[in-house]
């Protein structure tokens, strides 16, 4: 066990032994100890006050006092008072620091703090942080605050169980707070409020003081509006936190510039939020992702995927965002959504696929094409299942087709066209598009199914086609009522 010596105190300690000795029995937490009260009274004002003998006619040669200190820490302080030496290790340092603060023994206070800072450990960072706030120990507070913000996800439960409003605010307002996105902070504050049963006023103050609303998803904004019971959220112009700040995005940067960075990315959308996933950046495939809200014209952070991806496909289902296939791992699948700490790897596809057509009906994910120009297989993943299964084969190969659910049917369109009916578990042929296409898109406008874009034999197809539900055929759409 390391020994620390106060050399100045040691020089003066001999003089204390020449004074009259008074024995005192101290009843502490966990045991008793007999001390020379004369020496202890010289150690600090705390002991001078608490060991003062009551003046009575019949003085007891041995007095008794009760102190709210644990016996082990008190013993260390008593030994220091006799010898000028204190024994400190990782097992006793926190309790000894608290006891030395209560007893105003400055040498032990600063020795304990220096020991903690040199040999800092996660297991006592929460208690040290709270002592830093309670007793105004600035160097201990700064060090523990930095550690907690960087290891926030690991310490989340301990923070919820122990922190009050002030302790929480100092952490959550930090630029260094290590969170995957701002929705995570909103979810955490709600969780803290529910578990600790804090006053509603504390919750409202935290939300207003620490949340960076300009980086919230619609889901996060909805939660904040629910908490504040308002229709319009407060404006915030703070910079993004360092943990979700993109190194390749300069601030400020408009949405068009951000979209240009995500070259050859996968895209999908949920409501007004478009998700840009993977692609080609700096001459390599990357694992970055970002969300763009085209209504509020702001970007929303997304943590990096577990795998880099090019020519993947994305689909929202089960309140999550799924990314399927693509290079360099064409069978891999992962999922995430706002507020999640990280992407989660999902069961692998049965066949490798690039740019497959994907769609979801009743939270069942269907994957078609993307394997080869002759492949007609389909796969599906049921909610909460851990394995993909083959579904009914399509009539045509759909190597570069697209898919969309319209009118409770899953349409699969490219050079050929057909739709899937979940209730009958069958595919039905419909007329091929007037202009066959590779990599087109299906969209719904005014309750009409439109086929747009795509290439055929190296040429871009600029003609838009609209589906006729009565004749199972396609017509040229000119933007007028049809």
UniProtKB/Swiss-Prot annotation:
Annotated BACK domain ranges read: 125-222
Q: Name one Pfam family in it.
A: BTB
| InterPro entries referenced in this protein's UniProt entry, alphabetically | BACK (IPR011705), BTB/POZ_dom (IPR000210), Kelch-typ_b-propeller (IPR015915), Kelch_1 (IPR006652), SKP1/BTB/POZ_sf (IPR011333)
Keyword Glycoprotein on entry: no
Question: Where do the Kelch repeat units fall?
Answer: 273-319, 320-363, 365-408, 410-447, 448-482
Q: Keywords on this record?
A: Kelch repeat, Repeat
BTB domain residues are: 20-90
Q: Tell me, using the record's free text, what induces this protein.
A: Expressed in the early phase of the viral replicative cycle.
Record's function text: Might have a role in the suppression of host immune response.
The Swiss-Prot or TrEMBL record describes its family as follows: Belongs to the orthopoxvirus OPG047 family.
Descriptive protein name: Immune evasion protein OPG047
Question: Which organism's genome codes for this protein?
Answer: Monkeypox virus
Q: Which gene name belongs to this protein?
A: OPG047
